[in-house]
Protein backbone atom coordinates (compact mmCIF):
# COMPACT_ATOMS: atom_id res chain seq x y z
CA UNK A 1 0.00 0.00 0.00
CA UNK A 2 2.88 2.35 0.89
CA UNK A 3 4.50 1.75 -2.49
CA UNK A 4 1.24 2.62 -4.23
CA UNK A 5 1.00 5.91 -2.30
CA UNK A 6 4.59 6.78 -3.24
CA UNK A 7 3.78 6.09 -6.85
CA UNK A 8 0.80 8.46 -6.72
CA UNK A 9 3.01 11.14 -5.15
CA UNK A 10 5.55 10.79 -7.94
CA UNK A 11 2.84 11.06 -10.60
CA UNK A 12 1.42 14.16 -8.91
CA UNK A 13 4.87 15.74 -8.64
CA UNK A 14 5.61 15.10 -12.32
CA UNK A 15 2.24 16.57 -13.26
CA UNK A 16 2.89 19.69 -11.17
CA UNK A 17 6.33 20.13 -12.73
CA UNK A 18 4.84 19.83 -16.19
CA UNK A 19 2.21 22.43 -15.39
CA UNK A 20 4.89 24.73 -13.97
CA UNK A 21 7.06 24.40 -17.07
CA UNK A 22 4.07 24.94 -19.32
CA UNK A 23 3.19 28.03 -17.34
CA UNK A 24 6.75 29.37 -17.67
CA UNK A 25 6.60 28.75 -21.38
CA UNK A 26 3.31 30.62 -21.63
CA UNK A 27 4.58 33.61 -19.60
CA UNK A 28 7.84 33.68 -21.56
CA UNK A 29 5.92 33.64 -24.81
CA UNK A 30 3.69 36.45 -23.55
CA UNK A 31 6.69 38.67 -22.71
CA UNK A 32 8.39 37.73 -25.98
CA UNK A 33 5.27 38.80 -27.84
CA UNK A 34 5.23 42.14 -26.03
CA UNK A 35 8.95 42.66 -26.72
CA UNK A 36 8.45 41.92 -30.42
CA UNK A 37 5.54 44.35 -30.61
CA UNK A 38 7.54 47.05 -28.80
CA UNK A 39 10.51 46.50 -31.11
CA UNK A 40 8.32 46.74 -34.21
CA UNK A 41 6.81 49.98 -32.90
CA UNK A 42 10.32 51.50 -32.89
CA UNK A 43 11.24 50.37 -36.41
CA UNK A 44 11.03 52.77 -39.38
CA UNK A 45 7.63 52.74 -41.03
CA UNK A 46 7.41 50.63 -44.17
CA UNK A 47 6.76 52.55 -47.36
CA UNK A 48 3.06 52.56 -48.21
CA UNK A 49 1.71 52.13 -51.71
CA UNK A 50 -0.18 55.05 -53.22
CA UNK A 51 -1.23 56.37 -56.61
CA UNK A 52 1.22 59.17 -57.59
CA UNK A 53 -0.50 62.44 -58.45
CA UNK A 54 2.58 64.05 -60.03
CA UNK A 55 5.41 62.67 -62.15
CA UNK A 56 9.01 63.36 -61.14
CA UNK A 57 11.81 63.19 -63.71
CA UNK A 58 15.41 62.43 -62.76
CA UNK A 59 17.63 64.84 -64.72
CA UNK A 60 21.10 63.63 -63.77
CA UNK A 61 23.24 62.12 -61.04
CA UNK A 62 26.97 62.35 -60.43
CA UNK A 63 29.51 61.66 -57.70
CA UNK A 64 31.74 64.42 -56.35
CA UNK A 65 34.02 62.23 -54.23
CA UNK A 66 33.92 60.17 -51.07
CA UNK A 67 30.98 61.37 -49.01
CA UNK A 68 30.60 62.10 -45.32
CA UNK A 69 29.53 58.59 -44.33
CA UNK A 70 28.79 58.65 -40.60
CA UNK A 71 30.54 61.96 -39.86
CA UNK A 72 27.14 63.70 -39.77
CA UNK A 73 27.91 67.08 -41.35
CA UNK A 74 24.92 67.09 -43.74
CA UNK A 75 26.79 68.38 -46.78
CA UNK A 76 24.73 69.85 -49.58
CA UNK A 77 25.53 71.84 -52.73
CA UNK A 78 25.14 75.56 -53.39
CA UNK A 79 23.86 77.10 -56.63
CA UNK A 80 24.66 80.40 -58.37
CA UNK A 81 24.56 81.62 -61.97
CA UNK A 82 23.40 78.30 -63.40
CA UNK A 83 26.18 76.32 -61.71
CA UNK A 84 26.08 73.78 -58.88
CA UNK A 85 29.01 73.96 -56.47
CA UNK A 86 29.52 70.81 -54.43
CA UNK A 87 32.10 69.23 -52.16
CA UNK A 88 32.77 65.83 -50.63
CA UNK A 89 34.83 64.97 -47.57
CA UNK A 90 37.83 63.73 -49.60
CA UNK A 91 36.76 64.62 -53.13
CA UNK A 92 37.57 68.29 -53.49
CA UNK A 93 35.16 70.90 -54.86
CA UNK A 94 33.39 70.70 -58.22
CA UNK A 95 31.40 73.13 -60.31
CA UNK A 96 28.65 71.44 -62.34
CA UNK A 97 26.17 72.64 -64.92
CA UNK A 98 22.75 72.88 -63.24
CA UNK A 99 20.84 71.53 -66.24
CA UNK A 100 23.12 68.64 -67.23
CA UNK A 101 25.39 67.87 -64.28
CA UNK A 102 28.48 68.13 -66.49
CA UNK A 103 31.66 69.21 -64.71
CA UNK A 104 32.86 72.77 -65.38
CA UNK A 105 35.90 72.74 -63.07
CA UNK A 106 37.36 70.80 -60.16
CA UNK A 107 39.53 71.83 -57.22
CA UNK A 108 41.69 69.33 -55.32
CA UNK A 109 43.14 70.66 -52.04
CA UNK A 110 46.76 70.12 -51.17
CA UNK A 111 47.52 67.57 -48.49
CA UNK A 112 48.08 69.02 -45.02
CA UNK A 113 51.22 68.21 -43.07
CA UNK A 114 51.06 67.06 -39.45
CA UNK A 115 54.03 65.59 -37.57
CA UNK A 116 56.02 65.23 -40.80
CA UNK A 117 53.21 63.27 -42.41
CA UNK A 118 50.81 64.32 -45.13
CA UNK A 119 47.05 63.85 -44.86
CA UNK A 120 44.20 64.55 -47.25
CA UNK A 121 42.21 67.58 -46.19
CA UNK A 122 38.62 66.67 -45.33
CA UNK A 123 36.21 69.23 -46.73
CA UNK A 124 33.22 69.39 -44.42
CA UNK A 125 31.58 72.82 -44.33
CA UNK A 126 29.78 73.99 -47.41
CA UNK A 127 30.49 75.13 -49.96
CA UNK A 128 29.05 78.61 -49.76
CA UNK A 129 29.00 80.81 -52.86
CA UNK A 130 28.72 84.54 -53.53
CA UNK A 131 30.54 87.68 -54.71
CA UNK A 132 32.75 85.67 -57.06
CA UNK A 133 33.88 83.21 -54.38
CA UNK A 134 33.26 79.58 -53.51
CA UNK A 135 34.20 78.99 -49.86
CA UNK A 136 34.68 75.67 -48.09
CA UNK A 137 35.61 74.73 -44.52
CA UNK A 138 37.49 71.67 -43.28
CA UNK A 139 37.45 69.36 -40.27
CA UNK A 140 40.84 70.87 -39.34
CA UNK A 141 39.44 74.40 -39.13
CA UNK A 142 40.77 75.66 -42.46
CA UNK A 143 38.72 78.10 -44.54
CA UNK A 144 39.52 77.96 -48.27
CA UNK A 145 38.26 80.59 -50.73
CA UNK A 146 38.20 79.72 -54.45
CA UNK A 147 37.62 81.78 -57.57
CA UNK A 148 34.04 81.06 -58.62
CA UNK A 149 34.93 81.21 -62.32
CA UNK A 150 37.69 78.59 -62.48
CA UNK A 151 38.19 77.07 -59.01
CA UNK A 152 41.67 78.45 -58.40
CA UNK A 153 42.57 79.06 -54.76
CA UNK A 154 42.52 82.73 -53.70
CA UNK A 155 43.24 82.62 -49.98
CA UNK A 156 43.15 80.55 -46.81
CA UNK A 157 42.26 81.37 -43.23
CA UNK A 158 42.00 79.47 -39.97
CA UNK A 159 39.34 79.07 -37.28
CA UNK A 160 39.82 77.31 -33.92
CA UNK A 161 37.50 74.35 -34.54
CA UNK A 162 36.07 72.17 -37.31
CA UNK A 163 33.72 73.78 -39.83
CA UNK A 164 30.62 71.68 -40.50
CA UNK A 165 28.23 74.34 -41.82
CA UNK A 166 28.29 76.23 -45.09
CA UNK A 167 30.02 79.63 -44.96
CA UNK A 168 28.04 82.67 -46.10
CA UNK A 169 29.28 85.57 -48.23
CA UNK A 170 27.69 89.02 -47.90
CA UNK A 171 28.78 92.65 -48.24
CA UNK A 172 32.45 91.79 -48.89
CA UNK A 173 32.66 89.49 -45.88
CA UNK A 174 32.98 85.71 -45.60
CA UNK A 175 31.16 84.46 -42.50
CA UNK A 176 32.12 81.12 -40.96
CA UNK A 177 30.54 79.31 -38.02
CA UNK A 178 32.86 76.78 -36.38
CA UNK A 179 31.70 73.86 -34.25
CA UNK A 180 32.70 75.60 -31.00
CA UNK A 181 29.93 78.17 -31.54
CA UNK A 182 32.22 80.94 -32.80
CA UNK A 183 31.30 83.10 -35.82
CA UNK A 184 34.29 84.58 -37.68
CA UNK A 185 34.13 87.23 -40.39
CA UNK A 186 36.90 87.48 -43.02
CA UNK A 187 37.58 90.06 -45.70
CA UNK A 188 36.32 88.50 -48.94
CA UNK A 189 39.21 89.94 -50.97
CA UNK A 190 42.15 89.13 -48.68
CA UNK A 191 41.03 86.57 -46.09
CA UNK A 192 42.02 88.88 -43.24
CA UNK A 193 39.87 88.40 -40.15
CA UNK A 194 37.61 91.38 -39.40
CA UNK A 195 35.76 90.21 -36.29
CA UNK A 196 34.55 87.21 -34.36
CA UNK A 197 31.73 86.45 -31.94
CA UNK A 198 31.85 83.56 -29.46
CA UNK A 199 28.76 81.77 -28.15
CA UNK A 200 28.97 79.40 -25.18
CA UNK A 201 27.69 75.90 -25.97
CA UNK A 202 26.01 73.17 -23.91
CA UNK A 203 27.74 70.10 -22.48
CA UNK A 204 25.94 67.83 -24.96
CA UNK A 205 24.57 68.76 -28.37
CA UNK A 206 23.30 67.22 -31.58
CA UNK A 207 25.93 66.71 -34.28
CA UNK A 208 25.58 69.48 -36.86
CA UNK A 209 25.47 73.28 -37.17
CA UNK A 210 22.92 75.52 -38.84
CA UNK A 211 24.22 77.43 -41.87
CA UNK A 212 24.57 81.17 -41.34
CA UNK A 213 21.78 83.25 -42.90
CA UNK A 214 22.28 86.91 -43.77
CA UNK A 215 19.86 89.81 -44.14
CA UNK A 216 20.36 93.53 -44.75
CA UNK A 217 23.22 94.37 -42.37
CA UNK A 218 22.45 91.35 -40.16
CA UNK A 219 23.84 87.85 -39.56
CA UNK A 220 21.43 85.22 -38.18
CA UNK A 221 22.99 82.30 -36.30
CA UNK A 222 21.36 79.15 -34.93
CA UNK A 223 22.97 78.06 -31.65
CA UNK A 224 23.43 74.74 -29.85
CA UNK A 225 21.71 76.12 -26.73
CA UNK A 226 18.41 76.39 -28.61
CA UNK A 227 18.53 80.07 -29.52
CA UNK A 228 18.67 82.16 -32.68
CA UNK A 229 21.00 85.19 -32.55
CA UNK A 230 21.25 88.31 -34.68
CA UNK A 231 24.65 89.99 -35.07
CA UNK A 232 25.58 93.23 -36.82
CA UNK A 233 27.18 92.25 -40.11
CA UNK A 234 29.94 94.85 -40.10
CA UNK A 235 31.33 94.33 -36.59
CA UNK A 236 29.62 91.28 -35.01
CA UNK A 237 27.80 93.22 -32.28
CA UNK A 238 24.94 91.18 -30.72
CA UNK A 239 21.58 92.70 -31.67
CA UNK A 240 19.15 90.20 -30.13
CA UNK A 241 18.81 86.56 -29.11
CA UNK A 242 15.60 84.54 -29.05
CA UNK A 243 14.93 81.04 -27.65
CA UNK A 244 13.54 78.53 -30.16
CA UNK A 245 13.67 75.44 -27.94
CA UNK A 246 14.00 75.72 -24.16
CA UNK A 247 16.63 73.26 -22.80
CA UNK A 248 14.43 71.56 -20.18
CA UNK A 249 14.86 68.11 -18.63
CA UNK A 250 16.68 66.19 -15.90
CA UNK A 251 19.55 64.95 -18.07
CA UNK A 252 21.85 66.54 -20.63
CA UNK A 253 20.23 64.32 -23.27
CA UNK A 254 16.75 65.58 -22.41
CA UNK A 255 17.96 69.19 -22.48
CA UNK A 256 19.34 69.07 -26.04
CA UNK A 257 17.61 71.85 -27.99
CA UNK A 258 19.99 72.68 -30.86
CA UNK A 259 18.98 74.91 -33.74
CA UNK A 260 20.76 72.95 -36.48
CA UNK A 261 18.40 73.37 -39.44
CA UNK A 262 18.85 76.34 -41.77
CA UNK A 263 16.54 79.21 -40.72
CA UNK A 264 14.50 80.70 -43.56
CA UNK A 265 14.29 84.48 -44.04
CA UNK A 266 11.11 85.27 -45.97
CA UNK A 267 10.77 89.02 -46.41
CA UNK A 268 11.39 90.32 -42.89
CA UNK A 269 10.15 87.18 -41.13
CA UNK A 270 12.42 84.38 -39.91
CA UNK A 271 11.25 80.79 -39.53
CA UNK A 272 13.37 78.39 -37.46
CA UNK A 273 13.04 74.97 -35.85
CA UNK A 274 14.86 73.26 -32.99
CA UNK A 275 15.67 69.73 -31.82
CA UNK A 276 13.03 70.28 -29.10
CA UNK A 277 10.31 69.93 -31.78
CA UNK A 278 9.62 73.68 -31.72
CA UNK A 279 9.01 75.99 -34.68
CA UNK A 280 9.10 79.75 -34.27
CA UNK A 281 8.25 82.65 -36.55
CA UNK A 282 9.80 85.97 -35.55
CA UNK A 283 10.51 89.44 -36.85
CA UNK A 284 13.98 89.60 -38.36
CA UNK A 285 14.76 93.23 -37.42
CA UNK A 286 13.68 92.98 -33.76
CA UNK A 287 13.62 89.27 -32.88
CA UNK A 288 10.03 89.64 -31.62
CA UNK A 289 8.19 86.28 -31.73
CA UNK A 290 5.13 86.16 -33.98
CA UNK A 291 4.05 82.60 -33.19
CA UNK A 292 5.45 79.34 -31.87
CA UNK A 293 4.27 75.73 -32.23
CA UNK A 294 5.23 72.37 -30.72
CA UNK A 295 5.97 70.89 -34.14
CA UNK A 296 9.47 70.88 -35.60
CA UNK A 297 12.79 69.09 -35.49
CA UNK A 298 16.51 69.17 -36.18
CA UNK A 299 16.06 69.78 -39.93
CA UNK A 300 15.19 73.16 -41.40
CA UNK A 301 11.67 74.24 -42.41
CA UNK A 302 10.34 74.66 -45.93
CA UNK A 303 8.43 77.90 -46.52
CA UNK A 304 5.90 78.48 -49.31
CA UNK A 305 3.60 81.44 -49.93
CA UNK A 306 1.06 80.17 -47.39
CA UNK A 307 2.46 77.11 -45.58
CA UNK A 308 5.47 76.39 -43.35
CA UNK A 309 6.32 72.68 -43.54
CA UNK A 310 8.43 70.96 -40.87
CA UNK A 311 9.44 67.35 -40.15
CA UNK A 312 9.61 66.41 -36.48
CA UNK A 313 12.03 64.03 -34.79
CA UNK A 314 9.47 61.20 -34.88
CA UNK A 315 9.14 61.43 -38.67
CA UNK A 316 5.78 63.18 -38.89
CA UNK A 317 5.52 66.02 -41.41
CA UNK A 318 3.43 69.06 -40.45
CA UNK A 319 1.92 71.83 -42.53
CA UNK A 320 1.55 75.03 -40.49
CA UNK A 321 -0.35 78.14 -41.47
CA UNK A 322 2.26 80.74 -42.36
CA UNK A 323 0.52 83.65 -40.65
CA UNK A 324 -0.64 81.96 -37.43
CA UNK A 325 1.31 78.70 -37.08
CA UNK A 326 -1.92 76.71 -36.76
CA UNK A 327 -1.56 73.07 -37.85
CA UNK A 328 -3.30 72.62 -41.21
CA UNK A 329 -2.36 68.97 -41.72
CA UNK A 330 0.05 66.24 -40.65
CA UNK A 331 1.45 63.17 -42.43
CA UNK A 332 2.60 60.21 -40.31
CA UNK A 333 3.29 57.68 -43.10
CA UNK A 334 7.06 58.37 -42.87
CA UNK A 335 7.37 57.79 -39.12
CA UNK A 336 10.85 57.00 -37.78
CA UNK A 337 12.47 57.21 -41.24
CA UNK A 338 14.99 59.87 -40.06
CA UNK A 339 13.73 62.61 -42.35
CA UNK A 340 15.78 65.51 -43.68
CA UNK A 341 14.80 69.13 -43.53
CA UNK A 342 12.06 70.24 -45.93
CA UNK A 343 12.34 71.76 -49.41
CA UNK A 344 9.51 73.32 -51.42
CA UNK A 345 9.20 72.41 -55.11
CA UNK A 346 6.17 73.92 -56.81
CA UNK A 347 3.02 72.84 -54.97
CA UNK A 348 4.86 70.16 -53.01
CA UNK A 349 6.99 69.73 -49.89
CA UNK A 350 9.92 67.33 -50.27
CA UNK A 351 11.82 65.35 -47.63
CA UNK A 352 14.50 62.67 -47.89
CA UNK A 353 15.02 59.65 -45.66
CA UNK A 354 17.60 57.20 -44.34
CA UNK A 355 17.19 54.80 -47.27
CA UNK A 356 17.82 57.41 -49.97
CA UNK A 357 14.16 57.97 -50.86
CA UNK A 358 12.65 61.37 -51.59
CA UNK A 359 8.98 61.95 -50.80
CA UNK A 360 6.78 64.65 -52.37
CA UNK A 361 3.77 65.76 -50.29
CA UNK A 362 0.97 68.05 -51.41
CA UNK A 363 1.17 71.45 -49.76
CA UNK A 364 -2.62 71.62 -49.67
CA UNK A 365 -3.27 68.57 -47.47
CA UNK A 366 -0.01 66.64 -46.90
CA UNK A 367 -1.03 63.68 -49.06
CA UNK A 368 1.79 61.63 -50.59
CA UNK A 369 2.14 62.69 -54.22
CA UNK A 370 5.34 61.07 -55.54
CA UNK A 371 8.39 59.08 -54.52
CA UNK A 372 11.84 58.68 -56.08
CA UNK A 373 15.16 57.26 -54.96
CA UNK A 374 18.44 59.13 -55.14
CA UNK A 375 20.59 56.04 -54.68
CA UNK A 376 20.78 53.60 -51.77
CA UNK A 377 22.74 55.76 -49.34
CA UNK A 378 21.31 57.86 -46.55
CA UNK A 379 20.02 61.38 -47.15
CA UNK A 380 20.92 63.69 -44.25
CA UNK A 381 21.13 67.07 -45.96
CA UNK A 382 18.08 69.19 -46.65
CA UNK A 383 17.23 69.14 -50.39
CA UNK A 384 17.71 72.38 -52.32
CA UNK A 385 15.44 73.78 -55.05
CA UNK A 386 16.71 76.32 -57.60
CA UNK A 387 14.97 77.28 -60.87
CA UNK A 388 12.49 74.45 -60.38
CA UNK A 389 15.25 71.80 -60.06
CA UNK A 390 15.60 69.86 -56.81
CA UNK A 391 19.12 68.85 -55.79
CA UNK A 392 20.03 66.40 -53.06
CA UNK A 393 23.38 65.04 -51.85
CA UNK A 394 23.66 61.69 -50.08
CA UNK A 395 26.24 60.47 -47.57
CA UNK A 396 28.21 58.70 -50.31
CA UNK A 397 28.94 61.99 -52.11
CA UNK A 398 26.41 61.56 -54.94
CA UNK A 399 24.32 64.51 -56.13
CA UNK A 400 21.04 63.91 -57.96
CA UNK A 401 18.76 66.40 -59.71
CA UNK A 402 14.99 66.04 -60.14
CA UNK A 403 12.35 68.10 -61.91
CA UNK A 404 8.58 67.91 -61.77
CA UNK A 405 7.20 66.71 -65.12
CA UNK A 406 5.57 69.43 -67.17
From Swiss-Prot:
<keyword id="KW-0449">Lipoprotein</keyword>
<feature type="signal peptide">
    <location>
        <begin position="1"/>
        <end position="23"/>
    </location>
</feature>
<keyword id="KW-0998">Cell outer membrane</keyword>
<dbReference type="InterPro" id="IPR017687">
    <property type="entry name" value="BamB"/>
</dbReference>
<dbReference type="InterPro" id="IPR002372">
    <property type="entry name" value="PQQ_rpt_dom"/>
</dbReference>
<keyword id="KW-0732">Signal</keyword>
<comment type="similarity">
    <text>Belongs to the BamB family.</text>
</comment>
<keyword id="KW-0472">Membrane</keyword>
<dbReference type="InterPro" id="IPR011047">
    <property type="entry name" value="Quinoprotein_ADH-like_sf"/>
</dbReference>
<dbReference type="InterPro" id="IPR018391">
    <property type="entry name" value="PQQ_b-propeller_rpt"/>
</dbReference>
<protein>
    <recommendedName>
        <fullName>Outer membrane protein assembly factor BamB</fullName>
    </recommendedName>
</protein>
<comment type="subunit">
    <text>Part of the Bam complex.</text>
</comment>
<dbReference type="GO" id="GO:0051205">
    <property type="term" value="P:protein insertion into membrane"/>
</dbReference>
<dbReference type="GO" id="GO:0009279">
    <property type="term" value="C:cell outer membrane"/>
</dbReference>
<feature type="lipid moiety-binding region" description="N-palmitoyl cysteine">
    <location>
        <position position="24"/>
    </location>
</feature>
<keyword id="KW-0564">Palmitate</keyword>
<dbReference type="GO" id="GO:0043165">
    <property type="term" value="P:Gram-negative-bacterium-type cell outer membrane assembly"/>
</dbReference>
<feature type="lipid moiety-binding region" description="S-diacylglycerol cysteine">
    <location>
        <position position="24"/>
    </location>
</feature>
<dbReference type="Pfam" id="PF13360">
    <property type="entry name" value="PQQ_2"/>
</dbReference>
<comment type="function">
    <text>Part of the outer membrane protein assembly complex, which is involved in assembly and insertion of beta-barrel proteins into the outer membrane.</text>
</comment>
<dbReference type="InterPro" id="IPR015943">
    <property type="entry name" value="WD40/YVTN_repeat-like_dom_sf"/>
</dbReference>
